[in-house]
């Protein structure tokens, strides 16, 4: 009896939460690397690559950087090559 009572409470809470939420859709900005005069993605350009790496040294996902899928793949490959050639560190040290 307690299980059904708890289950009905959670079901009503979920419905109430959905009705109370307001959904806002924001228009995504375009890819910053697909615009005219955008910098070329190259493993020899660590200043560009460091913008797409987190403070801990991890590659940032495209949903955060707003980079299109094609450029994201090129970025990931360039970052990996730059790490192997010691142009970028694998892990950033905490200061």
Swiss-Prot record:
- What does the record give as the function of this protein? Binds as a heterodimer with protein bS6 to the central domain of the 16S rRNA, where it helps stabilize the platform of the 30S subunit.
Checking Gene3D superfamilies in the record gives: Ribosomal protein S18 (4.10.640.10)
Q: Which PROSITE patterns match?
A: RIBOSOMAL_S18
**What organism is the protein native to?**
Rickettsia typhi (strain ATCC VR-144 / Wilmington)
Does RNA-binding show up as a keyword for this record? yes
PANTHER family xref list: 30S RIBOSOMAL PROTEIN S18 (PTHR13479), SMALL RIBOSOMAL SUBUNIT PROTEIN BS18M (PTHR13479:SF40)
Q: What is this protein called?
A: Small ribosomal subunit protein bS18
Q: Could you give a single Gene Ontology term from the biological process aspect? A: translation
**GO-annotated cellular components:** cytosolic small ribosomal subunit
Write the record's keywords in alphabetical order, separated by commas: Ribonucleoprotein, Ribosomal protein, RNA-binding, rRNA-binding
Give the similarity note: Belongs to the bacterial ribosomal protein bS18 family.
